[in-house]
């Protein structure tokens, strides 16, 4: 499970010449955008605080013209590798061994969870493909992002007050499909994919750790699908400098995402989601004030 993370840590600690090369061939703003995108995406992807909202806000703060799609794809790939590496044993059971039981008479928890993850993924796959096919652009209006952050933070707050009795082995088709419907709201910038999935699971009575784990498992098909759709938009680009950026963002986002997952799961044993609710609301208010004055 730790093989990739140790390999990547060794790469970044001892391969300083690559950083020197990057600094030499890139201007400061480009290098800054790479670092910020990697760190923000890695830290925020699996927390209920919206990675897209943070990236857009930082874009406004630094007056960058737009979010570099290539960097976003690389960052998503990094976080995808982080969650699959961290939960490698679970991924083998649920995504590799689980589907093989489809022809078996005796179904285990592995197959049931795989099936429920599949059910949860259907709504956003269909809706996301629909938007992509008809070339419907997402609405990235700054006010919408701030307002959705506040609204979905409050929903998380109220869901966290719910009684918690269910564990992952209690999940039903109805539960998984409801979580899948909620995940469609993740297409609204500022809502947070992790946040809406956790909110739905908490409303359904799952404890915090199980809600977060299910959200992280569900991120694997969700991020894979989103990255697959975006990948074709950048595949035709062929540049040495571009690939240096892609590799750097991938490794950095992997590292930050991996350690964020570990820290988040340990932290949840001691606290509830109120910290994240307050943080998101304060950031949204600051964002609204910033938009008014600047």
Label each PLM-derived region with a short phrase:
Residues 3-294:
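Multi-pass membrane proteins that catalyze or facilitate reactions on polyprenyl-/lipid-phosphate substrates
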